[in-house]
Swiss-Prot record:
It is found in: Cytoplasm. SUPFAM superfamilies: S-adenosyl-L-methionine-dependent methyltransferases. It comes from Shewanella sp. (strain W3-18-1). GO terms for cellular component: cytoplasm. PROSITE patterns: PCMT (PS01279). InterPro entries: PCMT (IPR000682), SAM-dependent_MTases_sf (IPR029063). Catalyzes the methyl esterification of L-isoaspartyl residues in peptides and proteins that result from spontaneous decomposition of normal L-aspartyl and L-asparaginyl residues. It plays a role in the repair and/or degradation of damaged proteins. This is Protein-L-isoaspartate O-methyltransferase. It catalyses: [protein]-L-isoaspartate + S-adenosyl-L-methionine = [protein]-L-isoaspartate alpha-methyl ester + S-adenosyl-L-homocysteine. Its main location: cytoplasm. GO terms for biological process: methylation; protein modification process; protein repair.
Length: 211
């Protein structure tokens, strides 16, 4: 990172701390990650604003507060193996890869997946496995997972993802069609408990693959 980018990332982490993010490991990862790398050059000057930004193909890079909040929720059971559904720009994956030993991430849009893979390689993050495919179905041959994060809004909770959690595993996702609820769902053997965390706004989780 350049000195200017590092200063901007550190300042962003301070703003997120003031906004209520308490996990110091999450804040450290935010402060060390060059968000401008995950944006087109035309939007790089907005990289450290606490706002969602377009990345093409009708997708967005999430607001940094939401990235930090979802990561904080995901880490509640100290997961070792995590699945991310919706790689997008790769920014959320870059944060997670600094915090968990093993990350698997799925993206249905091929162009975004290729770009994200290149970005994480440039950041020397090598504990990440990438898949081009339908996130609704999860990644069954790499399951079970200690935690799963979905970075797009599902109209209903995907059953396939619930089935791929370990006992005690956590699923963090937005649920709803317009304004959504960010939820944390915990598996207790064959039953599940859920918590509504806060109101959020995400692009929809879409079935299938897109070249």
């Amino acid at each position: 990172m350049t000195r200017v980018a590092l200063t901007s990332a550190v300042n962003l982490a301070k703003k997120l701390s003031d906004a209520g993010i308490r996990n110091q490991a999450v804040l450290k990862a935010i402060s060390q990650t060059p968000r401008e790398m995950f944006l087109d050059n035309a939007l790089a000057h907005k990289a450290y604003e606490n706002t969602a930004l377009p990345i093409g193909q009708g997708q967005t890079i999430s607001q940094p507060y939401i990235v930090a909040r979802m990561t904080e929720l995901l880490l509640s059971n100290m997961p070792k193996k995590v699945l991310e559904v919706g790689t997008g720009s790769g920014y959320q994956a870059a944060i997670l890869a600094q915090l968990v030993p093993e990350l698997c991430t799925i993206e249905r849009i091929k162009g975004l997946q290729i770009q994200a893979r290149q970005r994480l390689k440039r950041l020397d993050l090598h504990n990440v496995s990438f898949k081009y495919g339908d996130g609704w179905q999860g990644w069954s041959n790499r399951s079970p997972f200690d935690a799963i994060m979905v970075t797009a809004a599902a109209a209903t909770v995907p059953e396939a993802l619930l089935s791929q959690l370990v006992d005690g595993g956590v699923l963090v996702l937005p649920v709803g069609e317009n304004t959504q609820q960010l939820m944390r769902i915990t598996r207790h053997r064959e039953r599940f408990s859920s918590e509504n965390i806060e109101t959020v706004k995400f692009v929809p989780l879409v079935n299938g693959e897109l070249a």
